[in-house]
Amino acid sequence: MASKKSGGSAKNGRDSFSKRLGVKRYDGQVVKAGNILVRQRGTKIYPGKNVGLGNDYTLFALIDGKVKFETSKGKKVVSVYPLDA
């Protein structure tokens, strides 16, 4: 009688490395220009005042200042406001 060892275990058991997405600088934190604020897939959070949007939808600070998360027209927005000196 023909026999074959059961296969299939090699077809499972893979996983990808986590992409370390999410908010990197929180509301009220002081940031420098160029600091990454949010890493995301798609625009879950939109850029506001003094915030740039990268090719991979990364949000980053354009000026030195304080981070502020807001909602505008039902969308989450992150802005950076200059520190009052």
Swiss-Prot record:
InterPro entries: Ribosomal_bL27, Ribosomal_bL27_CS. One of its GO terms (biological process) is translation. Keywords: Ribonucleoprotein, Ribosomal protein. GO terms for molecular function: structural constituent of ribosome. GO terms for cellular component: cytosolic large ribosomal subunit. Signal peptide: none annotated. Belongs to the bacterial ribosomal protein bL27 family. HAMAP family: Ribosomal_bL27. NCBIfam families: L27. This is Large ribosomal subunit protein bL27.
